[in-house]
Structures are given as C-alpha cells and as structure tokens.
Amino acid sequence: MYNAKTKKKRKNITLGIVYIKSTFNNTIVTFTDMQGNAIAALSAGAIGFKGAKKATPYAAQVIVEKVSEVAKEHGIKTLSIRIQGAGSQRESALRAIFNQNFIVTSITDTSPVAHNGCRPPKKRRV
C-alpha cells in the first residue's frame, strides 16, 4: 500500500536540467538529472491555480520557486535550461530561476517548428 508520508531518498546531484513547457493554458516545470530522471515536477494546476489563472506569469514564478526548493534539497547547483512552447509565462519562469541563485550553463529553445504539415480543410461557403 502506498504511504504518502515516506520520504524520498536524497540524491547528491550537482548538475541538472530544467524543462519549462509553457502553453497558452498552463505551465509545467520539471527538474531532472543529466540522464533525464525526474527529480521534481509541478504544474500550475497541481499547485492550486484554476482556469485562466494557470496561464499567468505569476503562476509560472510560483511553480519555479516550489520546484527549485526540492532541487536544492537534492544538491543541484548548476542548471541547463530547456524551454518549450509559446506562452507568456516563459520569461517570468526564466527570471524566477535566475533569482534562485543557480549557475546556468545554457538556455535552449526546443519548441517544435511546423514545416507546413497537413493541408487545411477547404473554406466554408455560406
């Protein structure tokens, strides 16, 4: 049976990767080690923001602050940042990471770029 009060083992990791996925409706922040194993992940809805408040820059800032506390407990000091998406929360999440006194080695934008995929449906005639 799952016991919510059991504490995870503390890993001593110095290098990590932060994934910031910013959509028009939500923001998801994930801290991983260099192999990609997730250490901490949160979204605006998981913290308690509802509806349109999930897509605010303030929500992204709060997410980064909460997730970085867990990352600091695991010993992460140096980060590589990977940003995905086109939401308005990108910049505030980045500023919040810089305010947490991490050493940032690189910032990469991994947003997908369309290369004119499927043909759109025909225009409606009314």
Curated annotation (Swiss-Prot):
Annotated signal sequence range: none
A cellular component term, taken from the record's GO annotations: ribosome
Family designation: Belongs to the universal ribosomal protein uS11 family.
Name of this chain's protein: Small ribosomal subunit protein uS11
Quaternary context: Part of the 30S ribosomal subunit. Interacts with proteins S7 and S18. Binds to IF-3.
Function: Located on the platform of the 30S subunit, it bridges several disparate RNA helices of the 16S rRNA. Forms part of the Shine-Dalgarno cleft in the 70S ribosome.
Pfam families for the chain: Ribosomal_S11
Family matches, as NCBIfam families: PRK05309.1 (NF003698), uS11_bact (TIGR03632)
A GO biological-process term: translation
InterPro entries, A to Z: Ribosomal_uS11, Ribosomal_uS11_bac-type, Ribosomal_uS11_sf
Keywords of this entry: Ribonucleoprotein, Ribosomal protein, RNA-binding, rRNA-binding
Gene Ontology molecular function: rRNA binding; structural constituent of ribosome
